[in-house]
Amino acid sequence: MGSLSQQAHGPPDAPRSKEELLIHAKDFINQYFTSFQMNKTRAHFHRLGEINDLIEKSGTYDLTMAELTFGAKHAWRNAPGCIGRSQWSKLQVFDAREIGTPREMFEALCSHIRYATNEGKIRSTITIFPQRKEGRPDFRVWNTQLISYAGYKLGDGKVIGDPANVEFTEMCVEMGWKPKHGMFDLLPLVLSAAENSPEYFELPTELVLEVTLKHPEYPWFAEMGLKWYALPTDSGMLLDCGGLEFPSCPFNGWFMGTMIGSRNLCDPHRYNMLEPIGLKMGLNTETASSLWKDRVLIEVNVAVLYSFESANVTIVNHHDASTDFISHMDKEIKLRGGCPSDWVRMVPPMSGSTLEVFHQEMLLYNLHPAFVRQDVKPWKKHVWKSDQSVPINSCNPKRKLGFKALARAVEFSASLMSKALSSRVKCSIFYATETGRSERFARRLSEIFKPVFHSRVVCMDDYAVETLEHESLVMVITSTFGNGEPPENGKQFAQSLLDMKRKYDCDLGFLESCSSISTCIKSSILTEGPLAADVIGDRQSLAMGTGPLCNVRFAVFGLGSKAYPYYAAYGKYIYLMLQELGAERLVNYCAGDALYGQEQSFRAWSEEVFKASCEAFCLDNRNDAPGPQTKGDCSKVRIVPVENCQEPDLCQVLRNIHGKEVMPLILAERIQLQAKDSDQQTILIKLDAHNATDLKYAPGDHVAIFPANSPEIVDAILVRLDTSKGPSPDQVVKTEISTQLGTNDTWRSHLPICTSRTAFSFLLDVTTPPSQEILQVLATQASSDMDKHKLEQLASNSEAYEKWRLDLSPNILEILDEFPSLKIPPSLLLTQLPLLQPRYYSISSSQQKNPNEVHATIAVVRFKTQDGDGPVHEGVCSSWLNRSPIGTVVPCFLRSAPHFHLPEDPSLPIIMIGPGSGIAPFRSFWQQRLGEIENTMPSCENTMLSCETTIPSCENSMPSCENTMPSCENTMPSCENTIPSCENTIPSCENTMPSCENTIPSWERTMQPCQIILPSQTKKHFGEMVLYTGCRTAKHMIYAAELEEMKRLGVLSNYHVALSREAALPKMYVQDIIIKNAAAVYEIVMKKGGHFYVSGDVSMAHDVTRALELVLCQQGGREASQQVMSLRDENLFHEDIFGSFVRKAGGQRSEDE
């Protein structure tokens, strides 16, 4: 059974009452939050409360951009008369709610037409103008279609052009439009905006794409001069969303062929071309029985489809449209229990019974959000002003402005800028970072995009990924931390993308076998395919896209270091995930290597992506990326003295700048771990939290320490700066940067209130070689042409810059020395230098043993640049901690490393690989195990008696084994763990005392009572812990005595030390010992399901992984690399790695940027 066509009554001109509005608003917000599974959450209830308060106070409220996008898409989804609404999720929404004049409306509509036309590859688009408000005339587009043809009524009643537009054409002529009296004259747009008088605007001919109609078999068809426009844009609908009404919201999809061929050209009340074409075809038009009308109708529709397809303009035939809708309807019934449909409007105007929709039972009902048909003749209701004949842009005599008038003008100018920004395409630039470099690149990209797009920079952690589908243009700039991990503020973003993929698609592609984000990211490195493909020059229409992000265009730039096996892996993961979710890439994935050419890679990528973005959004005359803004302008930065003000607490300042929970720990103790005659220094620092209740960490976690720069370097920099015209270095100041909004300059704070000395000491990085961008700024301050030329060369020539950076690794002081003509105002340097970033160290303590302390094992960095011939450079943090007096406040925060924690089951054995300072996290492991053993076996002393009494029998029977027995006696505190060590001592007895061989069975028998007694007293069974460590020589060994103690106590089952430069021994590395103990390693990892931990620099970790692969291959005959990947995926293979020390490059390099 079909339905009758019901035309919804248009809403009244006045907005809804508060009560009715609140009902609609609550229903809509419930739909919105339910759509991404956040209903009944804190955010949901907060938004409901916020809207309720706004309606009570003002009688209305505003939708967020995400809510507006959701509403517009679902209004199309709910439209009962649209056969093409299966593409509802791909609708592009342009927010024009800040627009205030007809001229601004026209500019927004031109942008809409340009974007939607897309050179023929039509994109479904809607532009939404301000909502209806009490006491304000509506914003309206008076045309029923943005693009339509004029109709001229002649004296004899005949019409030239489109008869449907005769009345509107006459109204345009009355407004002053000059008619051309042709069959296909483009009508002007007539627009009204609130209290403004309506205005008409001619559409630029180059903006409107028209298709000349021709027939594949009738050459004469082209001679008839028929044509039609490519973009069908309905501008007479009202969007009813959340109780708010938007009377002006032009919307387009793309044509179905019959809309042009049957309705527009052949309908008797439109162009009525049936008979002229029938006569051309030689048909008998005198009798209906010849079915000439049907034959003409078919050929006209064939011509329309043929012409559009030949011109590469998007169009769909009515058969495919019918099939597509039936499929959509089936899905909707499964998902929502129904699909409102108007049979009369759904069935195409030809081939009725041959289509599935013709035979489909439909039910017509209304859902909200909704599109509602309005009065199509707004000029009938408009109250024309008596003085409208006066030109709107007429000039008044100039007069002088007073201060108040000038202030109002400034405010008005700022509001115009705000409106201009709101009408632009919005571009969201997401970043994730550990050191701040990704954020700096993101802000630089924003500066490039700002002149054309409405760009914003957002940290991934601050963004709700559920709203990503409502974005139009997305840029991602992210680093990779450690061994292929996301930065801390990018973890949730990564997980949310994976959750979205699993929600919308059961086919996970390269993610199918991944059990965690970490393995997903690592798997992305092995994925080729889309990354290797060239950018598709002729982009596919979004109508053909699939996935929840099919309406999003994106690009990704990854930062990393090729020293790492998972180079820039997180960026690649984001790139692949966005593609998997249906987003359209603008350019291929690009990564910048921290070791070489990162700045150059970013520059090339940013230029390419800017051009691609302008092309994607059809922005004309934007072929070149804007050049960087002049940052050397000292008038745009300033420091202002602050009188009678003390500096704020340093930890609070760092908390505000970095957004971390910074704690003031106290340096309680510092221990030199290496021998006095060692040429290296490694220190153990103990930080006291003085009973802080929020000190919580697990073995394997990290402590991030905010260091201070060397006082000598800071003092020397302050002496070299040009402070003649400014406050002294010890004067408390405000550091500010000028930003422009319209014509109004406003000053915003760049750093917290503090002295210049404090800023250079604790807040700014003065030791890292400056970027090319900073060198460009410094070049503006050089008074010598030679200095200026060299600085400009370094700033523009990436190859010269990289060589200079790697050879000299210069800090700011050395640059001031190298370029003596530099006279830099403190304000400029304070605003250009990057922030001093925290240094991350593995925690070397356990709260089981040290509940109020955090220990860290730190290699003190000290080296000479220029291959050992340059000045001495020191590590910022390690040197500060090495020289700071006991009692110094150390600002720091804790970071969880969940992938490097001990196994939840303590009975599982573990292997720990950590040469040099890589041993740091394993100290927390053995401290944790020692504490657990002590807490688990409170009555072990009683059980030791039975064990101790068995020892004399062995001693008496094997007097020469006496030296081996004490280790057994001393291991009794952890009695269960001593048995393997006791058994391990027996072979040495056998080897040293063959005569004792017969007594060993009695030893083993006498140990059984201990093993029988222990289970009744022991709560847990602990797996063995084996450590592989290494260093250059014995004097470089750290924690030697502690390791021996842990073995004596049975905490460590065993440990092995590799010495690589001991004179009397062959060179040995940890990977060599692993291969040497292949059988034992294989036993623990593969047969006992043990965990394998690696800590240290990246090159060592790579060698250890290769060694483990060799062990697995030799011992088990397995596919080695696949087996290690399987261990990773099962969370049995753990890595906590950092960059190697590269002397030429100036210190430690990490994959984190």
Swiss-Prot record:
It catalyses: 2 L-arginine + 3 NADPH + 4 O2 + H(+) = 2 L-citrulline + 2 nitric oxide + 3 NADP(+) + 4 H2O. GO terms for molecular function: calmodulin binding; flavin adenine dinucleotide binding; FMN binding; heme binding; metal ion binding; NADP binding; nitric-oxide synthase activity. SUPFAM superfamilies: Ferredoxin reductase-like, C-terminal NADP-linked domain (SSF52343), Flavoproteins (SSF52218), Nitric oxide (NO) synthase oxygenase domain (SSF56512), Riboflavin synthase domain-like (SSF63380). Heme b binds at residue 82. InterPro entries: CysJ-like_FAD-binding, FAD-bd_FR_type, Flavdoxin-like, Flavodoxin/NO_synth, Flavoprot_Pyr_Nucl_cyt_Rdtase, Flavoprotein-like_sf, FNR_nucleotide-bd, NADPH_Cyt_P450_Rdtase_alpha. (6R)-L-erythro-5,6,7,8-tetrahydrobiopterin binds at residues 3, 358. Sequence repeats lie at residues 934-940, 941-947, 948-954, 955-961, 962-968, 969-975, 976-982, 983-989, 990-996, 997-1003, 1004-1010. NADP(+) binds at residues 911-929, 1089-1104. It holds the Pfam family NO_synthase. The keyword Repeat applies. Its cofactor is heme b; FAD; FMN. Stimulated by calcium/calmodulin. Residues 427-610 form the Flavodoxin-like domain. Belongs to the NOS family. This is Nitric oxide synthase. It comes from Lymnaea stagnalis (Great pond snail).
